[in-house]
Amino acid sequence: MQANGAGGGGGGGGGGQGQTPELACLSAQNGESSPSATSAGDLAHANGLLPAAPSAAGNNSNSLSVNNGVPGGAAAASATAAAAQATPELGSSLKKKKRLSQSDEDVIRLIGQHLNGLGLNQTVDLLMQESGCRLEHPSATKFRNHVMEGDWDKAENDLNELKPLVHSPHAIVVRGALEISQTLLGIIVRMKFLLLQQKYLEYLEDGKVLEALQVLRCELTPLKYNTERIHVLSGYLMCSHAEDLRAKAEWEGKGTASRSKLLDKLQTYLPPSVMLPPRRLQTLLRQAVELQRDRCLYHNTKLDNNLDSVSLLIDHVCSRRQFPCYTQQILTEHCNEVWFCKFSNDGTKLATGSKDTTVIIWQVDPDTHLLKLLKTLEGHAYGVSYIAWSPDDSYLVACGPDDCSELWLWNVQTGELRTKMSQSHEDSLTSVAWNPDGKRFVTGGQRGQFYQCDLDGNLLDSWEGVRVQCLWCLSDGKTVLASDTHQRVRGYNFEDLTDRNIVQEDHPIMSFTISKNGRLALLNVATQGVHLWDLQDRVLVRKYQGVTQGFYTIHSCFGGHNEDFIASGSEDHKVYIWHKRSELPIAELTGHTRTVNCVSWNPQIPSMMASASDDGTVRIWGPAPFIDHQNIEEECSSMDS
């Protein structure tokens, strides 16, 4: 096949002259050669490789075609042969030139597309000419230019030239990701619809209402495609000015921006051998970076799709030294076992509850990440085993152990007790969760109490006979998840008083927590350890190994950027950290001397974590000393030894 109509073939005749343009397009798409070109030794690749240099036999009938369809012909072949004879080195070079592999051609085209996007057009022309490849099919080039110029009639004619390429069997295979229901005829109709829609909107913006109406009635409507969209487009006729049109249509307006977006949409319908998908090299590089991040066990920085934020010259590997594996501070103000710790939602404070009957609120220094005592809340006679921050961090609710029938609601800013709630001396209120509106909370315990209350402690609703171990309010504002003594997690709807089973374990659920998106649940299961459940599919996703979990209540947590990590205390005095996708721990933190009851990851500072222990201390964990936090990405180049 002589790509793009380049001259060649036996006796200096045009290669493939017997082919119709449609058949030539099909051959270009399918990687087929015309009979005459084959006999002359010229083979073309499916993505448009131009004919190779003259063969070792020195056949003058071969022709070297110029990029993008500029004819070479017999004269060019003769000139090349003469140059080869005059310059032995050049002739030898041409003779030794090998046909590029498919992957090499693909890479060259990707590079060419990227360079084109940078405006290095002359470099692209030279690259295509020297490699013998072409960036895209000539018809696709015309189509691109006409779309960007807004020449809609010519662009529509170009679609007819592209039709054989869209209809070819190879195109069907390449576009396997498209829905099977999309017929080949439908693809052309969709592309035409997108073109005419842009044409219609540009007429409207220019104030050419009659021309726009003509496009709507005589061109768009007869396509009988997406009638709902046509009704929407007809409504734009009522727009009084261009700004109103752009706002209602969510459209950038006539010009390069909107036409580039249109072209991106149109390219998805064409096989890549005809026209490359938009910004294909950037897409591949971004995918490679994302895969490396996914495989990086210690990656704990914000995901950024901008390739400028990473180096493409080295593999991405984060150092363990930037991970919260090192003790930064030991808080010793509690004088007895510390049962619970929890960072505020804004990450500026930490609340710790202890058997010593106090709650201590700590302030996090935004610069040094060190904590200092802010307030001590006293009077919890039975100790504090659970704490919950209100959504806006203005209030703090504290619960006690099994024997405690009271619940304390504190004003964080003033340190004053707003409400001390107790429904009955027989109650056991050991868990609490805030409704997302911040005006209600639910509380309960193992003696069968399950209440919904307002900020003044007034009882709004109750659910009888539910022995609650742990609670969590979902973001829908209606559903409350509760683990109970039947080794399950159930969902309770306080609006219609319905309930349903969500998770069923074989052993007691000591505590659980929910991911920010409400999809995953992390359970601490007696004698089993830490389990990850998918609440939507209601399946057990993973069992994490290493932790020692008996019948003590241990609270684990999600943490890090994107909640990619899981941390839990353990009865063997350690803190265990796992990557969410790995069952084996990536870190075991030592330092506590008794059971670690609770771990909390700072939601705003992903390199900070707190752990509370029966040894009476709270440990603050962070990166290794002397890490420059402003240049943490520089630490991602090598794994710490």
Swiss-Prot record:
TM regions (residue ranges): none
Described function: G-beta-like protein involved in cell signal transduction. Acts as a negative regulator in MAPK signaling pathway. Functions as a scaffolding protein to promote G beta:gamma-mediated PLCB2 plasma membrane translocation and subsequent activation in leukocytes. Core component of the CTLH E3 ubiquitin-protein ligase complex that selectively accepts ubiquitin from UBE2H and mediates ubiquitination and subsequent proteasomal degradation of the transcription factor HBP1.
Residues recorded as bearing Phosphoserine in the entry: 101, 103
Name used for this protein in its record: WD repeat-containing protein 26
Assembly: Forms homooligomers. Identified in the CTLH complex that contains GID4, RANBP9 and/or RANBP10, MKLN1, MAEA, RMND5A (or alternatively its paralog RMND5B), GID8, ARMC8, WDR26 and YPEL5. Within this complex, MAEA, RMND5A (or alternatively its paralog RMND5B), GID8, WDR26, and RANBP9 and/or RANBP10 form the catalytic core, while GID4, MKLN1, ARMC8 and YPEL5 have ancillary roles. Interacts with DDB1-CUL4A/B E3 ligase complexes. Forms a complex composed of at least WDR26, a G-beta:gamma unit, and PLCB2. Interacts with AXIN1.
Alphabetized UniProt keyword annotations: Cytoplasm, Mitochondrion, Nucleus, Phosphoprotein, Repeat, WD repeat
Region (Disordered): 1-45
WD repeats: 333-372, 379-418, 424-464, 504-543, 546-588, 591-631
Subcellular location: Cytoplasm; Nucleus; Mitochondrion
Bias kind Polar residues: ranges: 27-39
Domain LisH: 103-135
Listed PROSITE patterns: CTLH (PS50897), LISH (PS50896), WD_REPEATS_2 (PS50082), WD_REPEATS_REGION (PS50294)
Domain CTLH: 136-211
Gene: Wdr26
Keyword Magnesium applies: no
InterPro entries hit by this protein: CTLH_C, LisH, TPL_SMU1_LisH-like, WD40/YVTN_repeat-like_dom_sf, WD40_repeat_dom_sf, WD40_rpt, WD_repeat-ST_regulator
